[in-house]
UniProtKB/Swiss-Prot annotation:
Native source species: Rhodococcus erythropolis (strain PR4 / NBRC 100887)
Physiological role: Catalyzes the formation of 4-diphosphocytidyl-2-C-methyl-D-erythritol from CTP and 2-C-methyl-D-erythritol 4-phosphate (MEP).
Biological process annotations from GO: isopentenyl diphosphate biosynthetic process, methylerythritol 4-phosphate pathway
Site (described: Positions MEP for the nucleophilic attack): 151, 204
Reaction(s) catalysed (UniProt annotation): 2-C-methyl-D-erythritol 4-phosphate + CTP + H(+) = 4-CDP-2-C-methyl-D-erythritol + diphosphate
Organism taxonomic ancestry: Bacteria, Bacillati, Actinomycetota, Actinomycetes, Mycobacteriales
Name of the protein in question: 2-C-methyl-D-erythritol 4-phosphate cytidylyltransferase
Gene name of the record: ispD
Amino acid sequence: MAVVALVPAAGRGVRLGEKLPKAFVELGGCTMLARAVDGLRKSGAIDRVVVIVPPELVESVVADLGRASDVDVVGGGAERTDSVRAGLSAAGDADFVLVHDAARALTPPALIARVVDALRAGSSAVIPVLPVTDTIKSVDVLGAVTGTPLRSELRAVQTPQGFSTDVLRSAYDAGDVAATDDAALVERLGVSVQTIPGDALAFKITTPLDLVLARALLISETELSADSQDGK
């Protein structure tokens, strides 16, 4: 059963404070996008990766990623939902699709493989999650607290999110695609979304502090690897 990973990469990165689209911000010697794609390929669970970027950036992204037989770069639309639609069209007859944020550039390949394993085991929709450690409040438009959800019932959602291709296509064909993640669209169809344990390294690099943390983690990883080599 074929698995295709879709990587929408058109976000402008306003909150990150960078001039470049955030997928093209440097992280440890290469772009965040290149790291995200590399993690997908290293998982051993993905047959093909489809990267969706603004049409005018297709050639430069191909140059950044290198020409690989298992990576396609296609033009997307103005909104993320338009880009995912373009990715679904490029996915062809894949049995499963994963949708992955380029900004989650440090996602461990093992987490990606676990999402695919859950799909192959029979789930139609799978998302990695982490327990919420902060207390969460709901507020009104004036900032007044309106409620406190039970923390034990809340989870922070990560990517890649995995789906049966037919299910995700049906969700996008249903019309209303206003949602903060693809799983929410699938939920509206009445499809059960299965959760699996996420990974702290799959955090989304959204703010300048996130970028500092990601770069520090990579430096630490490089130093540990060098120490290990010296100890041989």
